[in-house]
Amino acid sequence: MTSRIVTDKAEPGSPEWLKLITASKIPSILGISRFKSQFSLWHEMAGNLPSEPIGIAQQDDFDYGHAVELAAGEYWRFKNPGWRLSRGEVQYTDDGFEFGNAATIDGRASRGSLRRIAEIKTARDLAEWGDDGSGEVPADYAAQVIWQQRVTGFTAPANIVLWPQYGKPKIYVIEYSAQLAAAIVAAVRKWNASLAASEPPELDDTISTYETVRRLHPEIDGREVQLDPDLAADYLTAVADDKEITKRLRGLKTRVLDVMGNAQTAVVIDLKIATRTPGRGDSISLRSNTKADPATIEGISA
């Protein structure tokens, strides 16, 4: 076994850390992250983006996360009698890989010679976490855990303890898949080759990529640049369409909220359409069920 505990851990955001393949980077490498695009991660790892200092709000989120880990760890212990759980994170690396790598696990569970991983995640609620009611772990988080299982060698079923701000905690189980792990490693090797060849991924329409392009060009030098006519026409058309769509969507949200009153969930028969959730301060947010197909409710008389 070529896995070992790392005693001199690289700090997240440091130049050393940026060069490592870590669990948090796996979803972006695979193109399944809901938060960071392939384009954004590539330029971060290539060193093309200036590091951003941790803001007060972000630090507060980190502090909250650390506090939650303590409570979630105790909850996991109650639900897994006979098992021990490490107090704090443990980082591993696999020296069998030809590239720098790390897997930092929130908790190392042990019972005798048995070992398994216990991860802790926070979210406002199950919907924000990504559970559509099926009880399945979102693909990006599942990929992270499979990477952790591969690097640590702890291939027993892992747990993710979800600690929502609203509702009770929930424990998910992630089964190890050697086939998926091999596919992830192959994708990582292809990713590293693109970095070595200075070949970034193509642009996409994610917020992450949009913000990255803005950060890549922070200066204004006064030059004039010629746009492709098709690109220019598409851009101006989309701007006009966006104004109309935004206005229409706002009106429809208003009507849905008005019908809902103080209700939590809006449905058609038994199909969930939208949910009212607590927002910032005293505000209320309306979350749509994006997985609902409008075609399935056409012609239904509610």
Segments from the language model and where they lie:
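Accessory terminal regions of nucleic-acid processing enzymes
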Residues: 1-302
